[in-house]
């Protein structure tokens, strides 16, 4: 597969933010999203989309002190995953960098260089997962697809 990568800074870019993922996902493909959590943030989300479906939904919720992961197929959400190896990895008012690595069986997610979870693929046609969406209570500063 192609190792095409874009590294584009987006200073003070308004969210929601959408961009295409060239060639879709494949094992070893990584995506990086960096920004600053707003000081009054309730939640934000990073979605990897496949048409109208959401293959991977990463949703830090400050009002619940949780990082929810899920998949939405045909407008129906699956079971939420919430377990983390440590405390909430995001803080209001602080910078963050999320690294999502696509593997053959799962997504591996790291925040600020620390692994926080694996999420098994529920939508299996990885090349069709070709859109990144970032929305919610953050200032987006950098995206690499």
UniProtKB/Swiss-Prot annotation:
PROSITE patterns: GALECTIN. Disulfide bonds: none annotated. SMART domains: Gal-bind_lectin, GLECT. Keywords: Acetylation, Lectin. Coiled coil: none annotated. One of its GO terms (molecular function) is carbohydrate binding. It comes from the Eukaryota. Residues 17-145 form the Galectin domain. SUPFAM superfamilies: Concanavalin A-like lectins/glucanases (SSF49899). Erythrocytes. The modification N-acetylserine is found at residue 2. GO terms for cellular component: cytosol; nucleus. Pfam families: Gal-bind_lectin. A beta-D-galactoside binds at residues 77-83. GO terms for biological process: negative regulation of CD4-positive, alpha-beta T cell proliferation; negative regulation of type II interferon production; positive regulation of gene expression; positive regulation of T cell apoptotic process. Monomer. May function in erythrocyte differentiation. This is Galectin-5. It comes from Rattus norvegicus.
């Amino acid at each position: 597969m192609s190792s095409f990568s874009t590294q584009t800074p987006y200073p003070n870019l308004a969210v929601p933010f959408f961009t295409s993922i060239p060639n879709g996902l494949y094992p070893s493909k990584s995506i990086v999203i960096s920004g600053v959590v707003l000081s009054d943030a309730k939640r934000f989300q990073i979605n990897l989309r496949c048409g109208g479906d959401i293959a991977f939904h990463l949703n830090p919720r400050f009002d619940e002190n949780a990082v929810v992961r899920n998949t939405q197929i045909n407008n129906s959400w699956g079971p939420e995953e919430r377990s983390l190896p440590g405390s909430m990895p995001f803080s209001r008012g602080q910078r963050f960098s999320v690294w999502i690595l696509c593997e053959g069986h799962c997504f591996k997610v790291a925040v600020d260089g620390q692994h926080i979870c694996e999420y098994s693929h529920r939508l299996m046609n990885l090349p069709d997962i070709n859109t990144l969406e970032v929305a919610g209570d953050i200032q987006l500063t950098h995206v690499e697809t």
